[in-house]
Every structure is written in structure tokens, then in C-alpha cells.
Amino acid sequence: MRGDDDWIKALARRAVDAGYKSITLTVDSSFYGNRERLSPTQLALRNVPERDFQKGITWDTVKLVQDTIGEVPFIVKGIMTAEDAAIAVEHKVDCVYISNHGGRQLDHVYGNIDTLPEIVEAVDGRCQIIIDGGFTRAGDMLKAIALGADAVAIGRLQAWALGAGNAEGLIKCLELLEIEIERTMGLLGVTSLDQLNPSYVGPAMPVRLPHEHSAFPHLPDDRIA
């Protein structure tokens, strides 16, 4: 947080006044992890303060934002445990967003898909659940839906598509993804997402040792240096 409570409220009001359909509070990045892959770039952000006004985000912060935005749907992003999901529901958030910040915050943390079932159980239908985590293929997205997620976020995939082909690239990416989803659902024998359930997903041993680019099987030499 780069300001005090008044700064938080002013920023939230600006978002509401600008017509945003929902407000998201990211709760897992009050401290940044060791991002060693970025060190060689010598990237520096000008006009951005190097220190934050307040590092601690508490459930009082959640209530502060909720009281400020009123009826606008409120999402808490960065939930990774059933315990935090249950507390979020008690605070009447509209959506729990499962995310480990791309796995860049803390080594050896659980993968998002690993925590999904216990969070679904803790939420028990009382709010919506979004999950992210480098999803790029329809099969993996449908696994998350089958395990109880209401939506799968694909920000990184869309950013790659925009970088590759601007708006046309993004449209093409979404069209290909739609085709892949339809084909996968057809092969599963379902006609709507609400027909999916955990029985469609089972454990499997990895076919190779995992690494930071395991999800991208078509990379030259198996990874980007």
C-alpha cells in the first residue's frame, strides 16, 4: 500500500466512479519475493516510491475497502488456504481468487490447483472462486472448473497474444481457446460446464521432472534460458 487509509479510500472511490464492475484487493504481495530472473535486466521504475506506506494488509483493510465501494463486487486475490478462504467468506467477500502470484513470491509453496479442492470445501458455495496459475490449455482450465472453480483467469496468456499480434492476436488466441474447449468438452461427453465435477479428474505421476517451464511442452530445448 503506497498510502494511508485515506489514500486507499480515495483510490477505491476513483475506481468506482470510473465505472469498474468489481474491485480486487491483492493480499499476497505486501512483500515481494526474490525475483532473481529480473536482476540482470537492471529494470528500474521511475516515479514509483521504493517504499510503501504500510506493508501490513489485515482483515480491517478488507472491511475498509468494502465500506468504501458499497455494492460493487469485491474480490480478494492471493488466497491459498482453506482457513483464509473461510475467513474471507465470514467477511462477506463476493469472490475468493486463488493465486500464488505466479509462483514468484515463495519457493516451495503449493500449486494453486493443489489448494483448490480444500478451498472449494471451505467456501461451500457461499461465494465465487477464481483461480489462475499459468493456464494456457483448455484441458487444464476444464480440470479447474471440474474441481470447483467458477472461472479461470488467463491474464498471462492474453498478454502473450497481445504481444504477438496486438488486438488481432488476442482475438485469434481466444478463438483457438474456444475451439479447444468445445472439443475437449465433446470428448468428455458434456455439453455445459456445470456438468463437470471432480470425478473427471484423477491423480497422475509427472512424465518428466518439473521445472519453471513444465507447462509449456513446445518450447525449444524444453525451456527458455
Describe each region flagged by the PLM.
Residues 113-225:
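Alpha/beta catalytic cores of nucleotide-metabolism and tRNA/nucleoside-modifying enzymes
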Residues 2-131, 138-160:
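Alpha/beta enzyme core
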